[in-house]
Structure formats: structure tokens, C-alpha cells
Amino acid sequence: MQGASLMSPKPPLVLVHGLWDTPNVFRRLRQHLEDWPAPILAPHLPHKLGFTPLKTLAQDLELAIDEAFGPDQTIDLLGFSMGAVISRTWLQLYGGHRRTRRFVSLGSPQNGTLVHSIRYF
């Protein structure tokens, strides 16, 4: 976490990495946001090579946000790739929409992927 105190006029910014990524994917972005006037959180959400269920990752995201900022703090949320799908799942299924001011989805497969439509015999 970095940035100003929780009393900042801007809510904390939460960055959610994608599948086969870690919070390190946001390293350069965080360098550009060094003077950002609010805390920044980029939690690590282990996916176990893609076998961790999406709902579990969304619950892990909620735990990380609650641990960092408490359950009532409004946040801004940026999800990259599968991280945006995890974020959307948290917003829609776990009440994240009640505390999220803005949600930004970057490069995400919100409509699924080609691999998802392949049938296994």
C-alpha cells in the first residue's frame, strides 16, 4: 500500500492482476502513480495455474480489500485481463458495487474466451 492516509479526498485505488500474473505487472504503473493522493493496493491473488474458481478469487479480493481498508471504505477498482473478470465477479456477486466508486476494465475477456467454447471429448 502506498499514498496518502485513508482520509484522502480520493478513495484508495485497488489494482487486480490477471491470470498467470502477479501484482508486479503493475510495477511501471505504480511508478507513474507515486504522487497519487490515495493509497494503492495491488493484492496477490494466487490462481494455481487457473484452477482456482473465479468465485474464490473474488472472495480473496474482498478479504484483501477489507484487510487493507476495512469493510466500509469506498474504493476505485482497476482490473487487468482476468483481474477485471475477478473484479466484476466481486462487484456483482459479493456486494462490491456498494463500495466501488469507479470500475475500470482493461484488456479483459468479459464475454469469455475462444478456449471457453472448445468442447472436450
Give the label of every model feature segment:
Residues 6-12:
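Proline/glycine-enriched tight loop/beta-turn segments at coil->beta junctions
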